Regions:
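Short, intrinsically disordered, charge-biased short linear motifs at domain edges
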Residues: 24-36, 75-86, 226-229, 357-362
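Iron-sulfur cluster-binding electron-transfer modules in prokaryotic oxidoreductases
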Residues: 3, 105-447
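Short secondary-structure transition/capping motifs
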Residues: 58, 78, 88, 94-97, ...
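N-terminal glycine-rich anion-binding loops that anchor highly charged ligand groups
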Residues: 43-47, 57-61, 233-234
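Generic, well-ordered alpha-helical segments
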Residues: 61, 78-81, 87-91, 100, ...
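N-terminal, well-ordered alpha-helical segments
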Residues: 47, 67-71, 80, 84-87, ...
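Cysteine-centered iron-sulfur cluster-binding motifs in ferredoxin-type domains/subunits
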Residues: 33-52, 83-103, 339, 369
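Non-heme iron-sulfur electron-transfer modules
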Residues: 2-28, 52-84, 102-130, 430-439
Length: 447
């Protein structure tokens, strides 16, 4: 069987002799950005960068953005001259996989965004901070939001809105509405619930915010698979990990939500902390760099979480899967979510697990690790460029569907699930879009 992941650019890395150098800022309040001078401008990142491929602009490439960062902190460019180019970066980290010099582009980008965030004014930033602070971490408000979306879709209101063409008045709103998945009405998961064998290895499952509202069934599928493989699953207090706030450069919110998440995930005293959302997992795995302990206890907690946190496919790949109850006849193409493949370096485990399911045939997807254009809320903030990047991805998906006869497209991140479902529906392809854990769960569920 051929490998189901065909990287668009084979990874390569070595340490450059300038690795310890930094770019000294002339602005007193700007970051040192250690490692900025490591870039040797070789251009290996260019064919790996979705925004460069879409625009052909050097300023929309990792190399170009690093140059702009350097000029900005040396007071040779105004913030307004570089901000649009940094905002258009997907933060997919694909350039880091391609870079032969080991440039930590993602860290440099986030530090620069964070230093700019306090200077930003206006309604857009205030609205995002309100959502990050008061909606995403709030269990009650999230459940109400989910119910209202469910009611909008199931009551006939959505059909009426479409029939009257009301969304055409606000094209941006129409784009956002098109991305909404069908909101599930599954039984809610609540803190303190436990599942699986009483003597099983204890694990905590992050419920999160957006993941639980849009994709609650994936949590139940995760519980099914973990329980079948001998794990005792505990549901912690709901928290938002702060990933979206981090991407927006709102470090104060990121830290506050981060510490809440650390305490919630460790409270059940698990052997492992399990994440089934690539974006959340990459954020939590970066807590050791993002969060600043204020006590010995916080330092201990941070070290403990760093040792225990795993993507669900990482944990399951530690040993052969338990026997399945029945076959799952599917031809599956796998899209490697950026924050799983490029940030967490979880690259082989998802397809290795899928290959163990009787009935599954893996279909190669060209450029499987190239970004789909979702990138958190990027597809809402930059819909045109996001659609262009998605169109490139969908060419490869269409080939896997029509030539390889794939009838399922799978990926391990909610943003990618939203984006690719939108792409598949727009292209009118006869494919389901599923999380890998949902495919595994089909083999364990009693029918």
């Amino acid at each position: 069987m051929s490998d189901s992941i065909t990287p668009h650019n084979p990874p390569s890395s070595h340490t450059h002799p300038m690795a310890s150098s930094g770019c000294k800022p002339l602005h007193g309040n700007l970051p040192q950005l250690d490692g900025l001078d490591i870039c040797i401008h070789c251009g290996m990142c260019l064919p790996a960068c979705p925004t460069y491929l879409a625009t052909g602009s050097e300023a929309e490439s990792p190399r170009g953005r690093l140059y702009l960062m350097k000029k900005w902190i040396q007071d040779e460019l105004e913030e307004s001259e570089i901000k649009p180019h940094l905002d258009q970066c997907l933060a997919c980290h694909s350039c880091e996989t391609a870079c032969p010099s080991g440039v930590q582009y993602g860290r440099l980008l986030m530090e620069t965004r964070a230093s700019m965030a306090p200077h930003r004014k206006g309604f857009a930033r205030s609205l995002k901070r309100f959502i990050f602070n008061h909606i995403l971490p709030n269990d009650a408000l999230l459940r109400v939001s989910g119910f209202l979306l469910w009611l909008y879709q199931r009551s006939g209101i959505q059909a009426l809105v479409h029939r009257l063409g009301l969304l055409k008045v606000i094209p941006a709103l129409a784009t956002q509405e098109a991305l909404l998945p069908k909101i599930p009405n599954n039984k809610a998961l609540k803190a303190g619930m436990t599942f699986g064998p009483a003597n099983g290895s204890p694990v905590t499952l992050l419920i999160g915010c957006v993941m639980d509202v849009f994709y609650n069934p994936i949590h139940w599928d995760t519980i099914t698979v973990l329980a079948a493989n001998g794990y005792r699953v505990s549901i912690p207090e709901r928290t938002c990990c702060g990933a979206l706030a981090h991407h927006a450069g709102e470090i104060d919110i990121t830290e506050r939500l981060g510490w809440q998440t650390v305490e919630a995930l460790l409270a059940p005293k698990p052997d492992w902390v399990v994440i089934n959302s690539a974006g959340c997992g990459s954020s939590i795995k970066e807590y050791s760099h993002l969060l600043k302990p204020q006590s010995e206890e916080q330092s201990r907690q941070l070290a403990e979480l760093s040792e225990k946190v795993l993507d669900v496919t990482e944990l399951l790949a530690k040993k052969p899967l338990a026997p399945f109850h029945h076959a799952v006849p599917m031809k599956v193409a796998y899209h490697a979510a950026c924050h799983l493949y490029h940030v967490q370096k979880v690259q082989k485990q998802p397809t290795e697990l899928l290959a163990q399911v009787p009935g599954i045939e893996l279909v190669p997807l060209e450029s499987a690790d190239m970004c789909c254009g979702s990138a958190g809320i990027y597809n809402l903030e930059h819909p045109d460029l996001s659609e262009e990047i998605l169109a490139e991805k969908m060419q490869h998906v269409r080939q896997a569907c029509t030539v390889g006869q794939a009838n399922v497209l799978t990926t391990g991140n909610p943003g990618c699930l939203l984006q690719l479902t939108h792409g598949v529906e727009s292209a009118k392809l006869d494919m389901q879009v599923l999380h890998p854990i949902s495919i595994l769960a089909k083999g364990y569920k009693q029918t």
